[in-house]
Amino acid sequence: VYKVEQIKKPLENYRDIDAFKIYVSDLGLLCAKKDLAANDILYMVEEINDFKGGMAENYVNVQLTMNGYRTYYWESERGAEIDFIIQRDGQLIPIEVKSADNTKAKSLRVYMDTYKPTYAIKLSAKNFGCEGNKKIVPLYAAFCI
């Protein structure tokens, strides 16, 4: 997943080929590589708290890719980061992924204040809903995007 330097269409033209993230296409393989037991994942034991965010992002990237989206990410000069940006129906949609109980999305607020998208998507453990122009989608429903 490449970082985009500018939020303009087409995103492909504004990617930074030297800044990227690598995701695994199979979460089972990722967990096996990290030597995580199935119960650790199912019950989200405290010892894996530092790894939950990466797993959630990886899962969402797999779902977005399977739905045909090309994914990018964005980072501000001050360190705000949007996990994914996709192009859908001619719009650039920022997507924030939250795995922790604290679902405040400060980076998403920075992005929205700067670029004024029509709407954004926040994936978390919360149920479906809306917060202003943010659509809240449960992580388990990432395939619906």
Label each PLM-derived region with a short phrase.
Residues 1-82, 86:
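Accessory nucleic acid-recognition modules appended to NTPase machines
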Residues 139-145:
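C-terminal helix of von Willebrand factor
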Residues 99-139:
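Catalytic cores of nucleic-acid endonucleases
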Residues 80, 89-90, 115:
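Structured loop/turn residues at beta-strand edges in well-structured enzyme cores
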Residues 29, 91, 99-100:
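Residue-level signature for short turns and capping positions that connect secondary-structure elements
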Residues 73, 94-97:
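Short catalytic-loop micro-motif centered on adjacent basic/acidic residues
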Residues 86-94:
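Active-site beta-strand-loop-beta-strand hairpin of nuclease catalytic cores
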